[in-house]
Amino acid sequence: MRHTDRFVKKVVIERIGDQRVLAEEEDVVIKEERISLYLNGTKLMSMMSLPSDQDAHAVGFLMSEGVIEKIEDLKSVQISSDGSSVYVEALINHENITNLFKEKTLTSGCCVGVTGNLEGNVLRKFIATPMQISLERIWEGMEEFEMSSHLFHETGCVHKASLLLEDGSKITAEDIGRHNAIDKVMGKARLGRIDTEKAVLVVSGRLSMEMVVKAVMHNIPMIVSRAAATFLGIKTAQELGVTLVGFARGEKMNIYTHSGRVDLRACKRKRGVTLHAPNQSSSLLR
């Protein structure tokens, strides 16, 4: 049995082509589950996600929302025996937990991602980390990222997030929602007490505002995706000091904001790099 088998189910489908049924056959689909999150003995919410890394998902989500402000405030996290519930005990920011339910923003994640603290948590933050990464390392990271997405290649139905760490290692998570995947990979880093201030977040989905906000809440200075960036994603990244890189495919990429963190000097393949908004604000954001 493969480790991914517990996340999938086989169903019978009718495959259509040339305006007719070509065959009736088995297909493999993702099996999501409802995961209940309990905080300090009270049920906070239920989330639809893959039944994996539930503890990391809970911690990453609560820290992304500012409910848990630092990992030292986490007392314990436990997963129920059937994997359907996560129990977190922690010192919490009561104002942020109130805001989480007072005004929700339905994000661009097709109802999988809902957040209540998109803007308030990051008003006092700015990522000023003076790190640099070579184009070669970004391209290598993207190649590894694409090659290792086993569940996506099998089902076409998951998002993935990876953290490329300063020492060359990486942390990876997958889920049906791109917000969930980011929360999981961030939670893994926090539970492992891993420094992410010079890490690069690689994601499979578009670079929207809420993706940038999640990165800022975990002090991530750079986000890279093979997908596009949205206007608010670019604007938020520019204002908060995040380097945003989109359309990173093959030997090409678009750098939208704070390009100084990408080292172009030693690269022999930089012909495919487009700088949309170098270190200063550009007309794109006005």
Swiss-Prot record:
Keyword Cytoplasm among record annotations: yes
Chain sites annotated for binding Mo-bis(molybdopterin guanine dinucleotide): 247-252
GO cellular component: cytoplasm
UniProt keywords, alphabetically: Cytoplasm, Molybdenum cofactor biosynthesis
UniProt GO MF annotations: sulfur carrier activity; sulfurtransferase activity
Subcellular location per the Swiss-Prot or TrEMBL entry: Cytoplasm
Active-site residue numbers: 110 (cysteine persulfide intermediate)
Any GO BP: Mo-molybdopterin cofactor biosynthetic process
Keyword check for Transmembrane: no
Transmembrane segments annotated in the record for this chain: none
Major subcellular site: cytoplasm
Similarity comment: family membership: Belongs to the FdhD family.
Purpose of the protein: Required for formate dehydrogenase (FDH) activity. Acts as a sulfur carrier protein that transfers sulfur from IscS to the molybdenum cofactor prior to its insertion into FDH.
Protein's recorded name: Sulfur carrier protein FdhD
